[in-house]
Amino acid sequence: MTYIVALTGGIGSGKSTVANAFANLGVPLVDADIIARQVVEPGTSALAAIASRYGENILQQDGSLNRAALRQKIFSEQQEKAWLNSLLHPLIQQETQRQLAGIDQPYALWVVPLLVENGLHHRADRVLVVDVTPDIQLARTMARDGITRQQAENILASQVSRQQRLACADDIIDNSGDPLMIAQHVASLHHRYLKLATAAQQDLHQ
C-alpha cells in the first residue's frame, strides 16, 4: 500500500503551489477537488440526481453543473448541504481509493482542502498543512476569485479555524513569504517522506 501524505490548508493558503512543487519532483497527486468535479460530470448519476432535486436551472447551457448556483442553494441550508454530501462523499471516496490503489510510487500526495472539516485526516499516514495568516487568506481569495471581503470572510468562517487545522498537522509549510523558499522546503519534505515510506514498507514486510 502506498504511503499517503495528505496536503491541506485553508482557502487562499496556496495549496496548489505546494502541490505543484511536489509534482515537479515526480510525486503522484490525488486531488479531491478534481475528483469532486469528475463525479458530477455530464452523464454521471450524481449530476442527474442534483438536476432532479434542484431543476434544470442548476445546469449550464452545455449540460455541466452550475457550481455557483449550487453553492448558493446549499450555503445557508444545512439540510441541503447534508443531502449533497451524502450523495457525493461516497463517490469521491470510492474514486480516491481507486486512484490511490493504482499508484506504484513510494508515496502519494492526497490534496484535500476540507481534510479536517470532513474528519479525513486519520486516513492519511502523514498530514502536511499549508499555513498563512487569515489576513493573507482573505487578500488572496478576494484577488483570485474577485469577491468582496465579506464573501471571503464567510468562506473562511465556514472552514475550521487555523488552530484546529494546525493541531492535526505532522508537518507545516509557511506559505506567507518568498515563493522560492517553498521549493526548498518541499524538497526537504520529499526526502523525509521517501524515508518514512520506505520505513513503513519495511515494517509491513517484517
UniProtKB/Swiss-Prot annotation:
Keywords: ATP-binding, Coenzyme A biosynthesis, Cytoplasm, Kinase, Nucleotide-binding, Transferase. Pathway: Cofactor biosynthesis; coenzyme A biosynthesis; CoA from (R)-pantothenate: step 5/5. Coiled coil: none annotated. ATP binds at residues 12-17. GO terms for biological process: coenzyme A biosynthetic process. GO terms for molecular function: ATP binding; dephospho-CoA kinase activity. Its EC number is 2.7.1.24. Residues 4-200 form the DPCK domain. It holds the Pfam family CoaE. PROSITE patterns: DPCK (PS51219). It is an enzyme of class 2 (transferase). It catalyses: 3'-dephospho-CoA + ATP = ADP + CoA + H(+). It is found in: Cytoplasm. Belongs to the CoaE family. Catalyzes the phosphorylation of the 3'-hydroxyl group of dephosphocoenzyme A to form coenzyme A. This is Dephospho-CoA kinase. It comes from Yersinia pestis.
